[in-house]
Amino acid sequence: MGDMSDLDRQIDQLRRCELIKENEVKALCAKAREILVEESNVQRVDSPVTVCGDIHGQFYDLKELFRVGGDVPETNYLFMGDFVDRGFYSVETFLLLLALKVRYPDRITLIRGNHESRQITQVYGFYDECLRKYGSVTVWRYCTEIFDYLSLSAIIDGKIFCVHGGLSPSIQTLDQIRTIDRKQEVPHDGPMCDLLWSDPEDTTGWGVSPRGAGYLFGSDVVAQFNAANDIDMICRAHQLVMEGYKWHFNETVLTVWSAPNYCYRCGNVAAILELDEHLQKEFIIFEAAPQETRGIPSKKPVADYFL
């Protein structure tokens, strides 16, 4: 099947942090769209699975993640969004994850983060990177169209709810999430926005978020949500934690962060969460990829885009 060998070649290229051609990006996005459009707003995922937080274009650290966590398709992965922006390799990072999704659709689940948005990527780097590497905004346009198709959340074995940011005062049940029309740019407010922007906070009820979008939500809100939906815990990303992961509210909410030495200067470690078939948890902590394994982006990259 020529399609698969083409795809495998593209995956190999992307694994080496080499760009694929613009027309290949177009075809890849078209295939990805066909797969993603079938997924639910609350995508069902079966254990065993390894859950990952923000990556933010840190390609060599994503390779390190695969080194410590196992490769696709041997390991089943769930990535909770924020694939792009801030790091140097958003293009290669997102396209590799997308190519793996198309090649092994049942072994990798990608859900949307607040950075999977046209507006945010124009400010935090992905737009400029696409322009620099391809000489036009076409690839950015293909990718941002795919962002609109990404699922908003996932549920592992019916028990662990995974979302990029957190809860929303407009949402009490998973069924209410299922009714959202997700195929759009992330709105400035409302339930879809809240899922991607909110944060847990040591408070009760709802609070105003300093981020200017989403809400702060307290332990009582979580207890109510988890009981109403018969789930054990909420797993989310969205916030840098220096130790790679952090428990909140008596282990009912977990933050997982998977970008080590964030922005190449924060000095944090990263974590991924391995869940076995009984949902037993094991955290794998990892550090930034050693300096010698990363091509530090030169000031004037060679063959930066395809004419």
Curated annotation (Swiss-Prot):
Coiled coil: none annotated. Pfam families: Metallophos. It comes from the Eukaryota. GO terms for molecular function: metal ion binding; protein serine/threonine phosphatase activity. It catalyses: O-phospho-L-seryl-[protein] + H2O = L-seryl-[protein] + phosphate; O-phospho-L-threonyl-[protein] + H2O = L-threonyl-[protein] + phosphate. Mn(2+) 1 binds at residues 54, 56, 82. It is found in: Cytoplasm; Cytoplasm, Cytoskeleton, Microtubule organizing center, Centrosome. Its cofactor is Mn(2+). Keywords: Cytoplasm, Cytoskeleton, Hydrolase, Manganese, Metal-binding, Methylation, Protein phosphatase. Binds 2 manganese ions per subunit. GO terms for biological process: determination of ventral identity; dorsal/ventral pattern formation; double-strand break repair via homologous recombination; positive regulation of BMP signaling pathway. It is an enzyme of class 3 (hydrolase). One of its GO terms (cellular component) is centrosome. Its main location: cytoplasm. Mn(2+) 2 binds at residues 82, 114, 164, 238. The active site is at residue 115. The modification Leucine methyl ester is found at residue 307. Belongs to the PPP phosphatase family. PP-4 (PP-X) subfamily. Protein phosphatase that regulates many processes such as microtubule organization at centrosomes. Serine/threonine-protein phosphatase 4 (PP4) occurs in different assemblies of the catalytic and one or more regulatory subunits. PANTHER family: SERINE/THREONINE-PROTEIN PHOSPHATASE PP2A-RELATED (PTHR45619). This is Serine/threonine-protein phosphatase 4 catalytic subunit B. It comes from Danio rerio (Zebrafish). The lineage of its organism: Eukaryota, Metazoa, Chordata, Craniata, Vertebrata. The gene is ppp4cb.
